[in-house]
Amino acid sequence: MTGYVRNMSFVKPSELEVLATIHSSMGRRILGIGSLYVLSLSVIYVAISQPPALGWQLFLLVLGGVSIWISEKMRRATGNVLELNHLELRDTSGVVIARIEDMVSVDRGAFAFKPSNGFLIRLRAGAERTWQPGMWWRFGTCVGVGGMTPGPQTKFMAETILAMITKRDLDLLKDD
């Protein structure tokens, strides 16, 4: 038998098969990251070339530095790919975003608090707060997926997760 041991239980290789992926859109990636870098450098340039009062100069330098940090974080985050298998949603850096067994619902509605071109997953219990700009975020029991991602890929993944949740819940009803 082949497989992987995970949480002291046997996992079949078929459960690790990738069902859907989300890649960041290159055009959005260039535009978003490029805009942030231009903003960062512009703010720092203004602070150095035409120094206002010392307090404002420090504020502009800090703002420029934070913008550069966010730009770099976004560049690294959008370099990853999100993968969905039968057990979990994860990114290619190895971070498990959410396990299928912990998911309660998926919301893609127009009025959902979700990223652009994305969807919102509600979890049974809260998890560690984290943010990967342009790809996904997690606050408490909510996971937002999307941002610099193509709409068709996120729609397919959202529908796949919804089908998996529905199947799981129906199987639980059958067992009762």
Which residues does each PLM region occupy?
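N-terminal membrane-targeting/pre-transmembrane regions
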Residues: 1-50, 142, 176
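Short secondary-structure boundary/capping segments
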Residues: 74, 81, 111-113, 134-137
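Conserved beta-hairpin
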Residues: 63-107
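Hydrophobic alpha-helical transmembrane segments of multipass integral membrane proteins
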Residues: 36-41, 61-68
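A membrane-cytosol interface segment of integral membrane proteins
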Residues: 125-176
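Hydrophobic alpha-helical transmembrane segments
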Residues: 50-63
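A broad, low-specificity signal marking well-ordered, structured residues that form hydrophobic/aromatic
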Residues: 82, 119, 143
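Acidic, Ser/Thr-rich low-complexity segments on the non-lumenal side of membrane proteins
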Residues: 96-126
